[in-house]
């Protein structure tokens, strides 16, 4: 906590206007980075950007409730929020893709973790959509990604396909 507090000055208005200055200050040469430390840093940065009212975007599996809380806070602070949600019809597709990534020297994720995150993320989808000004829902189960629907203000649904994937019906509509 103390170490992260030391990086608080990175987010002064002067520093935000100079991207190379920010990047230089975010180099942690003396720290062996692990996924937990990286997630704490990312959360700190997101909350700081909200605090100083700067626009930002981030990628997440959305498998923990803190992302819903972040959307709530952003909405309370007057941010316009957009969600680009991409899922597959089955967690085994994701498992297969991770195995392929490992073959290509990418990082591995245990199968049980992939499956658990898959269902937790889908479980948060409806609440996340309700908190957004606009949500774009995609299915990435096959080679071609399908744009399923666009949802405005958490209510108005504009379907982009004739056949709705089962996961969309089950977890969103």
Label every model-predicted segment:
Residues 9-12, 103, 130, 173:
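Generic surface-pattern signal
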Residues 57, 105, 109, 136-139:
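Secondary-structure transition/capping residues
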Residues 63-64, 87-92, 142-144:
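Conserved nucleotide-binding/hydrolysis micro-motifs of P-loop NTPases
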Residues 76-124:
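A glycine- and Lys/Arg-enriched "phosphate-lid" helix/loop adjacent to the NTP-binding pocket
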Residues 11, 17-85, 121, 128, ...:
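Glycine-rich phosphate-binding loop used to anchor ATP phosphates in small-molecule kinases
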Residues 1-13:
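N-terminal phosphate/diphosphate-binding loop that engages ATP/GTP or pyrophosphate donors
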Residues 127-173:
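NTP-dependent small-molecule kinase module
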């Amino acid at each position: 906590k103390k170490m992260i507090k030391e990086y608080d000055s990175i987010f002064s208005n002067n520093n935000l206007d100079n991207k190379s200055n920010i990047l230089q200050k975010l180099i942690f040469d003396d720290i062996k980075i692990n996924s937990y430390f990286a997630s704490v840093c990312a959360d700190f940065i997101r909350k700081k950007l909200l605090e100083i009212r700067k626009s930002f975007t981030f990628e997440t599996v959305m498998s923990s409730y803190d992302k819903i809380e972040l959307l709530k806070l952003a909405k309370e602070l007057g941010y316009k929020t957009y969600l680009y949600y991409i899922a597959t019809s089955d967690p085994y597709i994701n498992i297969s893709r991770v195995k392929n990534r490992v073959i290509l020297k990418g990082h591995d994720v245990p199968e049980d973790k992939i499956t658990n995150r898959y269902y937790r993320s889908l479980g948060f989808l409806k609440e996340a959509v309700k908190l957004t000004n606009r949500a774009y829902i995609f299915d990435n189960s096959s080679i071609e990604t399908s744009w399923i629907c666009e949802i405005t203000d958490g209510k108005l649904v504009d379907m982009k396909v004739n056949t709705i994937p089962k996961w969309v019906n089950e977890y969103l509509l």
